[in-house]
Amino acid sequence: DTKGETVVYIDKKEVFKTNGGKETFDAQLPLGTYDVYVKCICGGNDWGYTLECDTVEFESAARVKGTDDVWMYIGTFVNDFEFPFDTASDMLHIVGEPATYWRLDAPDTFVRPYNENTLFGRWNYPLGVTMYGLLHTAIAIGSEDIKNYIKDHVQLCIDTLEYALWDKEQYGGATSIHNLLTSIDSLDDCGSFASMMLEVNKYLGLRDVKKVADYVGDYIYNHQSRLEDGTFFRKEMMHHFHNMTMWAEDLYMSVPNLVRNSQFTGDQKYLDDAANQFFGFKKRLFMPEEKIMSHVYDFKYDSKTNVPWGRGNGWVVFSMTELLEVLPEDHPKRNDLIEFLNTLCEGYLALQDDEGMWHQVLNDHESYPETSCTSMFIYAFSRGIRFGWLKNPEKYVKAIYKAWKGISKTSVDSNGNVYGVCRGSEFSFIADYYKYELGWNLNDTHGTGIVMLAGIEVIRLNKFLAE
């Protein structure tokens, strides 16, 4: 029973059309589950339909909490609007211009999607690291299943951004998907995952990657807070405690993305920006006596904290090798970067313990052995050897194998569980915060991907030395 012209589609194919009134029709289909769409065109002053089936029951196309309704509605659209079945049916996209989304048969009752999975389809910095390690592991072992998992994860994040931005505009506040990308106030929110996204696109190919790459690239290059010399720092943050600070790990949150954005766009300015960041951070965070980096510089006190957090230091040299791999040989900052890399690696080498590990507080071996920073030093040392950046490479080869033995002994069990990865950090001028309060988590996503990357680098180093 319809009011006005009505068209019924089953799995995107038109099966029935009427100009209104009560009618019946048959649709013979093999056993299975099918999507049913009804296009209802306003007839006079009213529209609507009733669709009943004698042989099967309808069920909702999505699990919508709080209702038993089986029909959802979307519209209104102009009469000649071509409905995008492929994108609208997955319920990941807004539809039309102006945009709208699915709703129930009640006034202003829109359906609002949620991603309740903490590890799949999520966009955050630790998962960016995890997927990066997983990608190169999948390539190394030739696993199509893992490649497909990574691609599906990242593609879901790309596909839902447009909806998430609309969701925030409609309802305000944090969105139930992409709450970081829709409320960016730091490099943490965008740089790590976007860098990994571009790496996945390079190897596996993704749809519509440019719109997200441009969105993140614009924030990092044009909107992220900078000092007068162009160095990134934290200002006007949601977490006010972070205001007016500079964090060592922000080199990872920015530089790899700038590197890949330069490759993606062909624009040299991103590489120049990446190179300059290291010297701005060095000016504020470098601890020359030990040749390592302080975790944070607090501009409110015009002082660095002088606490060398392990993972923060790991991110510095990790990111430097990402840049040096693609920085042109004639770049004016290249030689200075290589010299800085050698200086830092000398400092880190001196702080390796007898079991091969580096510690949560690098210069305090009474703090716990920390897996993610140990993995990053393996990664940076190996790349420094393979690309010829490190002087006296023999001592670093020895340190790498010693560290990998330490990780194999204490950090990874026979089931692949990863131990000893520090959880997400705040900062302090007091080393005891890192030593006693900032503990580690089992299988923490801040470190699982890094352990995989370290393992890949050990394999690459073996091949390099054999040749």
Please place each PLM-identified region on the residue numbering.
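Long, well-ordered core segments of solenoidal/helical folds
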Residues: 88-117, 149-169, 211-233, 268-294, ...
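Structural helix-adjacent loops and short alpha-helical linkers that scaffold large soluble proteins
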Residues: 136-151, 199-217, 261-275, 323-343, ...
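Beta-strand-rich domains and repeat architectures in extracellular enzymes and scaffolds
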Residues: 109-140
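An acidic-aromatic loop/edge-strand motif
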Residues: 37-92
